[in-house]
Amino acid sequence: LVGSEMCIRDRVHWEHFYVGIFRCNQVLANVPAIEMDEVQKNQLLAQASFLRALWYFQINLLWEKGTLVLEPQNADYIPKDASEQEIWDQIEKDLTFAMENLPEAWDAADLGRATKGAAKALLGKAYMQQHKYDRAKEQLQWLIDREGSLYGLLDNREDNFTDLNENNQEGIFEIQFDDQNKGGTGNDASMAFGFQRTQFYAPGGTHGTGWGDGKARRWLVDEFLKERRVDGRNDLRLYNSILYKHFGDDFPDQSKKYYANEDASQWFDEWGQDTEDCYIRKYNTSYYREREDYFARNNYRIMRYADVLLSYAECLVETGTSASDAAVYVDKVRERAGLSKLKDSRWKDCLSSKEVFIKRLQMERALELCFEGWRWADLKRWGLLDSQAGIDELKPRDKDFN
């Protein structure tokens, strides 16, 4: 992996995944020999197994193969290639051990560590990527059954994207961040313990003090605007997720302030940007400061309960449950956003068949989970990347597929 800038970035990701795997392997190889409480020992081993599975999950998503390294090795060790299925098999083993030995919850001093629910949610996702929907449903059902005790949707969805209510009942697994620059060197996120994504997503120049990388697509804005809430207003998930030209017109009762800009809508015209220029607003830190930097304190939510609900609905309909019954779990997410149930919406015809329901569910996932890191997995699972019909479906929305 050498040559272009993209290849260099790929190499950095590859290297860092395997650095994480190496550290997990050190724990798994050495902790068993330590004399300590057996429950605590197994919890440590389970945490390492969970994280190793998480890194291998990403490797499978990005490269569909890798090298399966399960023990610490010398620097001159050259691993053999492993197939995608061999890696999935190891992920299943690691997560099965993790869920059997992790607690359902940690006390306040250990919040943020992997839990039984996190292992089950990730295992459910691993099964879904392999189209093992029966097995995935079983894992996700465990979390669904604990709604109201361990898990649930927050009343205010946006609390999932700030530092004001972290490790809450909707957060299944979160990467813990603070805003302190702890030093260090490197060309990547290893130089700080802060959340850096917003620095790269924020608009460039004095308007957003960021780099404008990873822009949103206009089709997503348009899709949000197709349906209003039951109170007649536009979907606030759009306001909190995407910054776009004339966004203030669509949300007249919301603030136009964005970082140091009292009216952020004006600089779209100042810079000659058109309606296709859209920026990712989710996770931004303008609620407490006027400029972005590399040290945001927001936790990054790897998995949250809204994702579990939508995934469970997909598993249900893929295993023979009616679209109407599966819609119950989609409606929980929609109603939290202020929308009507599917049966009362403009999309009510989606309940007529599995195929039509799946297409609507695909859009519901895009709206609720945009920019949270699961879109690539979704597209792969739905077969939209490996068939001409799938590519043709994506082309009108995203020019990168043309």
What is each PLM-predicted segment?
Residues 4-63, 78-86, 95-108, 286-300, ...:
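Conserved, well-structured interaction surfaces
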Residues 14-20, 90, 157-218, 295, ...:
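Long, intrinsically disordered, low-complexity segments
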Residues 59, 130, 317-319:
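Structural motif corresponding to the intra-repeat A-B loop/turn of tetratricopeptide repeats
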Residues 96-99, 113-264, 389-391:
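An aromatic- and glycine-enriched ligand-binding surface/loop that stacks and positions planar moieties
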Residues 236-335:
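C-terminal substrate/ligand-recognition segments
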